[in-house]
Structure formats: C-alpha cells, structure tokens
Amino acid sequence: AKMPDNFIDLTVTSPPYDGLRTYNGYSFPFEEIAKELYRVTKQGGVLVWIVGDATVKGSETGTSFKQALYFMQCGFNLHDTMIYQKISYMPNKKAKRYDGLFEFMFVFSKNTPKTFNEITEERTNIEKSICKKDIMVRQKDGSFKKSERINKGTTKKMGNVWTYLNNSNSTKDKIAFEHPAIFPEQLANDHIISWSNENDLIYDPFMGSGTTAKMA
C-alpha cells in the first residue's frame, strides 16, 4: 500500500551511496525514491538528505550533487546545503588528498518550510566583542552606511556546519552502533527540532539503524 499524497512533515535519512555499504543485496532505485518522497511530503514539509561521495579511480563520484539536482527536478527547493563535520574519522595516509571530514546534509523543502525552530549556541568572546561595535555595511554605490547591531546578546543562531562525534559515543544503543552506516543521534535530534513540531509525522525510508525513529 502506498502512503497518501502530502502525508509526511519531515524526512531525515542517509541513503546507501556509491556501493560503500551493502544491504543484503537490496537495490537502491534512487530516482523512484526521490519522486515518491516528493509526492508524500506535505506542502511546507522538509527532506534532510545526508550523503557523501566515494572516490573511484582517483575521482570523487559527484553522486551527492547529481542527487541534489534530481530532487530539484522533482520539484523540491534546495533550502540549504548544510555540512555534517565529523570529529572522529579514519585517516588515509596513502591518498594524495586531504582526509574527508564531512558529508552533505541537503535540506530540501516543498515550497517554503512551514516550520523553523532555530537552535542557538553561545557566542565566542571574540564574537561578543565584535557585537559591541557598530558595523559598517558597503552599499551598492560603494559608500558605507552604519548598520544597527542586530547581533545582540550572548547567543547566536547556529551556522549550517554542524559538528558531531561519529564513533561509539554518538549513540548509547549498542545495536545501532553495530550498523555499518550510523549517523549521530544528536544530528537527527537537531534536524527534528529545527524542521518539525510536536505531533508531526517523521519518516526515514531506509531506517538502517533506526536513529531517526528513536530520536523522534
């Protein structure tokens, strides 16, 4: 049975990509899944697609970008391109490239997101000092105009680069940690807080380690 149209408020998921993980021979029909996700997402709903790229014969595949563009072809807005930065990672001393520390978190929306509950964080001492000063903003004609200090207070809205542990400390669930493609519980929690409200319907079409369901 299919889900009804315009049914899901928020999807938070990380698909298998570029053959980096095997799922008991399960095939991954991306285009079919993308179309279905658009169909079942409510107007104003959000899809968070957490994905990276493999390196094959010396070149990154670019799969993440291809998928993002296809979601836009399906009708989604690319609301934000966020970064999941990993604190713990496996260094590759042999590769002639810098170690990969991040994955993309593409935030797609069906029209404008109906919900945004911003998460704040403490400002650094340097930021607090800067906020006490007047800010000069360059105008289109090249002149400068004093701007109001809009960034007041000791906290600020988080940026779109989120940093998490990605080892055994990222979950208290032993069964979840044994899954080959776990993402941090706090990451799922932060997206659920940001893009949904109580009693909204949260979805993960892959449900690998159950992190999204657990945090919802």
Question: What are these language model-derived features?
Answer:
Residues A1-A216:
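Core catalytic lobe of class I
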